[in-house]
Amino acid sequence: MLTIIIILFCSWNTNSFNFSNYKKDRKQAFTNGEKLRFRIGLGFIDAGYAEFEVAPYKKNKAYYHVIGKGFSSKTVDWFFKVRDQYETIIDSSTLYPVQFIRSVEEGNASFKQHYVFNQKEQKIFDGKDTISTSKKIQDMMSCYFYARNLELKNLKKGEILTFPTFVDSEIYNLKIKFLGKENIKIRAGKFKALKFCPVVQKGRIFENE
């Protein structure tokens, strides 16, 4: 999917904290009916858009059905057309996924993925194989909604949150670093925000902060 908010990258040379160290907020940060829309800009050009919608899964309030779509603008379509869709079905009590569906169309490349999570037995079926895990696992979209519900008032600047996540049939520790609090101004107005950046492995595309 198109990169939405993440614009900063950091190295791994710092202490890491698993998200399980932080309790979930009693009041959930999202609910059925929520709709989010982001504009992705490259300078003065609207490069694309990302949309998220939360709904009950087959009218079953025990699960959230989150659908995320990422698509390039008409201008960018001429060069690199993107039409991505992500779906995650999340247990509303634990906020861990039970299913993940991904459909990607980017340029000339396209593929689909469907994962089934058995969090109780700590197993994941990716359509071909069953992968055993040592802990509960998020998918690449459910971890965002899980993170929104963490109580982070005691989070210190420089700390890193780690999210064990199943991506492309492998388990990765996705990490984000807390950069502090910041007042931001966007088209919708002024907001108090918590600032994070993703952590990337040294020796890959980005090597320095």
What is the role of each PLM region?
Residues M1-S20:
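Bacterial Sec-dependent N-terminal signal peptides
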Residues F17-F117, L155-E209:
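Acidic, serine/threonine-rich low-complexity disordered tracts
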Residues A109-K153:
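Hydrophobic, well-structured mid-protein blocks that either form specific transmembrane helices
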